[in-house]
Amino acid sequence: MRQITNLGRNIENKSFSIIDEEAGPHSFAQEEWEVVRRIIHATADFDYKNITKIHPQAIDSGIQALKKGCPIVCDVQMILSGLNPERLKVYGCKTYCFISDEDVIENAKRKNSTRAIESIQKANSFNLLNESIIVIGNAPTALLEIEKLIRQEGIKPALIVGVPVGFVSAKESKESILKLEYYNVTSIPYILTMGRKGGSTIAVAILHALLLLSSKRGER
């Protein structure tokens, strides 16, 4: 998936060994741990061992969606910049981010909304959210909009990667995804980092972990 030298591979493997040793016991299944371990590798922050929540069907659903060439809808361009375009091309997956579109900016100003909310609404208007992987790494309002669309319009993404970072609504936006079951909503697979921590780097790490897991399974 990546152009990496033997030395680079050795350094990465050594890093993973250190993480495994220092992380100690955990309750994650093997494939789930490969996701969490890659998050820790990207951040050098072992807190993610405790704050990462992975839905029981998240890995399978994410890999199957990739195999089908699902749309990948992101809240910020930084996520797109971090993804491996060649690997996504193998799967036929297209990436989308509308946050800098002129109409999104104008609608946000006119409605006194946020660009993140309007970008998600635009994605929904193009029917890009059903059977998609939705990746939110920066904007809590985008994740809250996804939660609302699930409840009110019944959208069914294949996987939500909900890891927005921040002090305003980041914690609450992630909790809203967990609470969907209380609205008698069919459970949507998710990977979340609870609390304030998260970010685009985390989102990219999760997507790359899923791509690697898919390769290990022989899906591509």
Swiss-Prot record:
One of its GO terms (biological process) is cobalamin biosynthetic process. Keywords: Cobalamin biosynthesis, Isomerase. The keyword DNA-binding does not apply. GO terms for molecular function: cobalt-precorrin-8 methylmutase activity; precorrin-8X methylmutase activity. InterPro entries: Cbl_synth_CobH/CbiC, CobH/CbiC_sf. The keyword Isomerase applies. The active site is at residue 41. It comes from the Bacteria. Its EC number is 5.4.99.60. Substrate binds at residues 15, 38. It is an enzyme of class 5 (isomerase). Coiled coil: none annotated. It catalyses: Co-precorrin-8X = cob(II)yrinate. Pathway: Cofactor biosynthesis; adenosylcobalamin biosynthesis; cob(II)yrinate a,c-diamide from sirohydrochlorin (anaerobic route): step 9/10. Homodimer. Catalyzes the conversion of cobalt-precorrin-8 to cobyrinate. Belongs to the CobH/CbiC family. This is Cobalt-precorrin-8 methylmutase. It comes from Leptospira interrogans serogroup Icterohaemorrhagiae serovar Lai (strain 56601). The lineage of its organism: Bacteria, Pseudomonadati, Spirochaetota, Spirochaetia, Leptospirales. The gene is cbiC.
